[in-house]
């Protein structure tokens, strides 16, 4: 049975796990995207999202709470100065996990974990796809309209000749 197993231990002691998650969170905040295994990324997502939410209000207490988890002044400063401003209107879901396949050495499932608002490449692709879709739909709609007009005209004489 699965009672009282709320999080993945990742095969580590509690101190090792907390240190690893703290270091990974600092790397994510500094670099905006890191490559890791899927299990670690899911654990990191649970660890870092409440910290990002806490950074939305820039008070002394919230800075102390975040620093107690991260232990890195540069990461805390960047989180409160840059990231919290950029994600101010987002209600949650600050990170995204993108699976990249399996690692060659041990066949572990790998992925990127990144901050959602910092991936300009995906935002540009989405805009370009929308523009392409609207162009195609206009052309297909224009092509379908004349075909629809011609089709009833050809059907009417057939209906008259059949009667």
UniProtKB/Swiss-Prot annotation:
It comes from the Bacteria. Disulfide bonds: none annotated. Residues 129-138 have a biased composition (Basic residues). Residues 127-163 are annotated as: Disordered. Residues 142-154 have a biased composition (Low complexity). GO terms for molecular function: structural constituent of ribosome. One of its GO terms (cellular component) is cytosolic large ribosomal subunit. Gene3D superfamilies: Ribosomal protein L17. GO terms for biological process: translation. Keywords: Ribonucleoprotein, Ribosomal protein. PANTHER family: LARGE RIBOSOMAL SUBUNIT PROTEIN BL17M, RIBOSOMAL PROTEIN L17. Part of the 50S ribosomal subunit. Contacts protein L32. Belongs to the bacterial ribosomal protein bL17 family. This is Large ribosomal subunit protein bL17. It comes from Bacteroides thetaiotaomicron (strain ATCC 29148 / DSM 2079 / JCM 5827 / CCUG 10774 / NCTC 10582 / VPI-5482 / E50).
């Amino acid at each position: 049975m699965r009672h009282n197993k709320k999080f993945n231990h990742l095969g580590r002691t509690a101190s090792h796990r907390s240190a690893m998650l703290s270091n990974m969170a600092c790397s994510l905040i500094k670099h905006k995207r890191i490559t890791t295994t899927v299990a670690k990324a899911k654990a990191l997502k649970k660890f870092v999202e409440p910290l990002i939410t806490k950074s939305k209000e820039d008070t002394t207490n919230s800075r102390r709470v975040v620093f107690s988890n991260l232990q890195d002044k540069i990461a805390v400063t960047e989180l409160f100065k840059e990231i919290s401003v950029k994600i101010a209107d987002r209600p949650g879901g600050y990170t995204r996990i993108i699976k990249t396949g399996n690692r060659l050495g041990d066949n572990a499932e790998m992925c990127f974990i990144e901050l959602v608002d910092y991936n300009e490449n995906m935002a540009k692709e989405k805009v370009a796809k929308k523009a392409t879709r609207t162009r195609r739909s206009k052309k297909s709609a224009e092509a379908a309209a004349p075909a629809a007009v011609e089709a009833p005209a050809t059907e009417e004489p057939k209906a008259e000749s059949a009667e």
